[in-house]
UniProtKB/Swiss-Prot annotation:
Gene responsible for this protein: nuoK
Family: Belongs to the complex I subunit 4L family.
Catalytic activity line of the entry: a quinone + NADH + 5 H(+)(in) = a quinol + NAD(+) + 4 H(+)(out)
Protein name stated in the entry: NADH-quinone oxidoreductase subunit K
Transmembrane segments: 7-27, 31-51, 63-83
Organism: Gluconacetobacter diazotrophicus (strain ATCC 49037 / DSM 5601 / CCUG 37298 / CIP 103539 / LMG 7603 / PAl5)
Length: 104
C-alpha cells in the first residue's frame, strides 16, 4: 500500500523545518548560518501556505508562496550585501555580535 502525501503531512514537515530554522537562528552566531536558517524558516512558511491552500482548495496559498519567494530573494540579497561589506571592512569573523560596528 502506497501512502500519498496529504496536506497534514506537509504541515507537519513545515512545522519541523520551521523549528529547525528557528533553532539555527537561536543557536548559531555566524551570520551566514543565520541567513541560511532564516531561509529555511521562510521556505517552511511557504510550504505551510501551499499545504493550507491545497487543503481548502484555495489559490491564496500559491499567491502567498510567490510573495514569500520574493521576500526570501530580497532578504538573501540584502543579507549577503551586508556580509560582503563586513568582509571588505577587514573583519575576519562573521560573528553576529560584531555587526553593530558597521559604519558608512
Amino acid at each position: 500500500m502506497i501512502m500519498r502525501p496529504t496536506p497534514d503531512m506537509a504541515m507537519l514537515l513545515a512545522a519541523g523545518l520551521f523549528a529547525l530554522g528557528l533553532l539555527g537562528v537561536l543557536v548559531r552566531r555566524n551570520l551566514l548560518f543565520m541567513l541560511m536558517s532564516i531561509e529555511i524558516m521562510l521556505n517552511a512558511a511557504a510550504l505551510a501556505f501551499v499545504a493550507a491552500g491545497t487543503r481548502w482548495h484555495a489559490a491564496e496559498g500559491q499567491v502567498m508562496f510567490l510573495m514569500i519567494l520574493s521576500l526570501a530573494a530580497a532578504e538573501a540579497a540584502i543579507g549577503l550585501a551586508i556580509l560582503l561589506r563586513m568582509h571588505q571592512a577587514g573583519r575576519p569573523t562573521l560573528d553576529a555580535d560584531t555587526g553593530n560596528r558597521l559604519k558608512g
